[in-house]
Amino acid sequence: MQAGPSPIEWTEDGRPRFILYGDAYFGADDGLAESRAVFLGGCGLPGAWTGRRSFTVGELGFGTGLNILALLDLWRRAGPAGGRLHVFSIEAHLMPRDDAARALAAWPELSELAEVLIERWPEARRGFHRIDLPEFGAVLDLALMDAGEALAGWDGRADAWFLDGFAPALNPDMWREDLLQAVAAHSAPGARAGTFTVAGRVRRGLEAAGFEVRRA
């Protein structure tokens, strides 16, 4: 069974938008700055991995891969020498390779990382796909399937979570309380999660799952 390719259209200012939900993959101002502030900063990185030889990040909503490139960029600059970064990311609708390359070209500072990721971009085939990134001391496990199924099939625990599904009003399934409970069950002690949304239902769902919610 094939994971459905992501139907993309482009906004006038050059951002990819997912037609099914009518939502852009990142904000109009600066998607990279947004990723760094919301997800890296929201998860206390790089401080959270201080003194660690390995670190695991989980993500709901791989999208263009921008969050992961921002993470890899920080890891290569501020990660532990010889350390290992493991990323587990979930995406139900993988963006076509050419569209991802077009989207990521907006940030030349990430070009080295982007070229490697695009070169190893998997086929849109339902299942778990491992992308080895030894030049950056990292490995990416990309689950192309429903988030609930992906979490049920993963035996890991994340030290940090990037919760980056489309807006709750447009994609409520990504923010279901049972899904947030599963995220909590796959979290290491002291794990932190970053998310762009301040929707009340998401805040309540995170609190019910055991997270302490604070606005950054």
What are these regions (language model features)?
Residues M1-G58, L72-E112:
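Rossmann-like AdoMet
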Residues G61:
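Conserved glycine-centered beta->alpha loop in an early N-terminal alpha/beta scaffold
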Residues T64-L69:
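Glycine-rich SAM-binding Motif I of class I
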Residues A101-W154:
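S-adenosyl-L-methionine
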Residues D159-M174:
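A short SAM/SAH-binding and catalytic strip from SAM-dependent methyltransferases
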Residues A160-F162, S187-T197:
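Conserved beta-strand signature within the Rossmann-like core of class I S-adenosyl-L-methionine
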Residues D173-G190:
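A short glycine-rich, Lys/Arg-flanked "PGG" loop and its adjoining helix->strand segment in the class I
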Residues R203-A216:
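Conserved Class I S-adenosyl-L-methionine
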